[in-house]
Amino acid sequence: NGMFQLGRIEKLHDYFSACSRRREQAVFFYRVAGYSGEVAAFLNQYDQAARTNGVVIEGRIPNPDPKQLDYLAEMMGSDFQLDAGFLTQKLTRWLPRLTGVQREAVVTAMTATLQDLQAHGKNENMLRNAYIKYMCWLYYKFERILGRLGGDELPKILYDGTVSSYELQLLVILARAGADIVLLERAGD
């Protein structure tokens, strides 16, 4: 179906294995709460990997500002449809550097995530707002790693903070499209 499956790690170090060497060639998405010496060493290494080939988010991803929203509307119009054809057309214009395979992965992942929201009773306007956030964040925050989605050396995302529901949805999209994710919650549960 064009989406990466979330895999299970045996040990933290599995995060650093190439995609082709993993069972089911899966991505990893884990929440880390609580520390030990081993976890601290892993996080240090993962942080370095994310800085080299990925994105480190400390705190929150800022909401799109008025300039970013205006630019999106100017470039893409303000219409929205929960439809793979519509999303493909929009992503082709908005993120032209994605390969066809990467674009399809992002579209499939975004469609699945928006359908999940719809199944949980979110209305058209809420879905449109989610779509606008995703598009702005992909462009302004994650654009430099999108071209590496699904490669053998998967891009790494480290989210260090308390994740919001929109942010979590976007991280799920990125994982489904071919990125490894670690959510670090220092406050624990």
Annotate each language-model stretch with its function.
Residues 1-13, 19-135:
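Conserved N-terminal ligand/cofactor-binding loop architecture of enzyme catalytic domains
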Residues 12-22, 142-151:
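Short boundary motifs at domain starts and secondary-structure transition points
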